[in-house]
């Protein structure tokens, strides 16, 4: 049974995975729930605030369902990032995003980052780093490995493993949560998206943490608990 992203109950909004989720792209483009000139005007305002914003291709989530044997299927339509960003200043575009996140670990510690003050979502809040949007035509696991290098300056030790899919109701985004073992902790300054990076115990993530990060705490504890013995080998 498909789950409406706005109506699924709390138990349905987290799906544990034993294999990567399937992303099925529909043939119909995303149609916003409001007039396009409102979106364009709001996007122009956001770009004036933060010139680093980019209106790149993203997926809108139409629905999510379990498909048995520890998997999930995510039905999506193509659109661009502005449909997501404008919601943060009150434009009801109807967009439901698809993100990719990681619990990146080394030697029993997790990588967290304090988001920049000009980030579109969760500014000045801590989150598990890295994170980003699932880009069309890029595998979600490959994408989060790329984000680790671009945002944190660290290479992955092995391929990202998808552990769960969950819904962040604050920003209306479905997130694929991955495990990433790192080659080493970050030793370079983070890019503009983070004010700073730290390695912490999964049970002691700094405050204020984002609502999304709070949802990921149990995922992180499972990942780190299962991986401590392997990080230093």
Give residue ranges: language-model regions.
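Short alpha-helical functional segments enriched in proximate histidine and acidic residues
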Residues: 151
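N-terminal leader/linker segments that precede catalytic domains of diphosphate-processing enzymes
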Residues: 1-125, 132-146, 154-186, 205, ...
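Lipid deacylating catalytic domains
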Residues: 195
């Amino acid at each position: 049974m498909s789950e409406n992203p706005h109506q699924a109950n709390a138990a349905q909004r987290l799906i544990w995975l034993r294999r990567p989720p399937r992303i099925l792209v529909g043939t119909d483009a995303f149609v916003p729930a409001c007039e396009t000139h409102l979106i364009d005007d709001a996007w122009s305002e956001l770009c004036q605030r933060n010139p680093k914003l980019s209106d790149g291709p993203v997926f809108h989530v139409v629905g999510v369902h379990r498909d048995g044997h520890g998997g999930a299927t995510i039905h999506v339509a193509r659109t661009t990032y502005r449909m997501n960003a404008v919601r943060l200043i009150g434009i009801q575009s109807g967009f439901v995003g698809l993100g990719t996140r990681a619990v990146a670990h080394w030697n029993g510690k997790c990588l967290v980052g304090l988001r920049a003050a000009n980030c579109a979502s969760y500014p000045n809040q801590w989150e598990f780093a890295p994170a980003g949007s699932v880009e069309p035509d890029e595998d979600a696991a490959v994408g989060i490995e790329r984000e680790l290098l671009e945002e944190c300056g660290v290479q992955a030790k092995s391929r990202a493993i998808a552990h769960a899919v969950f819904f962040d109701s604050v920003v209306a985004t479905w997130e694929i949560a991955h495990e990433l073992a790192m080659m080493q902790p970050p030793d370079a300054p983070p890019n503009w998206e983070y004010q700073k990076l730290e390695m912490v115990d999964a049970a002691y993530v700094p405050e204020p943490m984002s609502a999304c990060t709070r949802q990921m705490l149990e995922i992180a504890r499972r990942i780190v608990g299962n991986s401590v013995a392997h990080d230093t080998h």
